[in-house]
Amino acid sequence: MNKIFRKFENKEYKLKPNDIIYTPKPVAEIMIKMCNIQPNDTVLDPSKGGGVFFDNLPECDKSYCEITENIDFFDASGKYDLIIGNPPYSLWNKWLDKTMELTDKFCYIFGIMNFTHARMARILDKGYVMTHYHLLKISYWFSHSVIVIFEKKPINTYMTKFSVSAETCYCDICGKDCGRGSKGNSYNKCYAK
């Protein structure tokens, strides 16, 4: 996977000022494929960027799409089937709260340094579970990043029995054993069955 991203290390994807990190096209393609977007889904990409998610959506009638500029994500309303993007890390907590108000499913890129116990607890406490993740290493970004999909799901017997925790999910994503069993066990605890 790293070989693919080395091809895209050029000026187009370098870090930009004002908390804007442009998402490379191959990363957007992976995210879109992971989300399994259906033809009638309403999808929101609230991040400021070059439109890489919009441009790579699966076949859809883009005449029904709306691109708005100078609109604040925090003023958005309604419900969406999916929110996808690479949000500004400086606004993570506020961004997550607004996201969870607007959707039951979201797919974001988290920098590992932003994937904290507190943020995981904030997400899990609202009834979301991690359904997919994909670890990325893009050398010109700050550190490792992870694509994560969270979905609001009813608590089921499996999750209740094993008690999903923010610590379990966080440690597994970082590739560490939390001391609660093998990494394999931690990995399974993060998934809805």
Locations of regions flagged by a protein language model:
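Class I S-adenosyl-L-methionine-dependent methyltransferase catalytic core
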Residues: 1-193
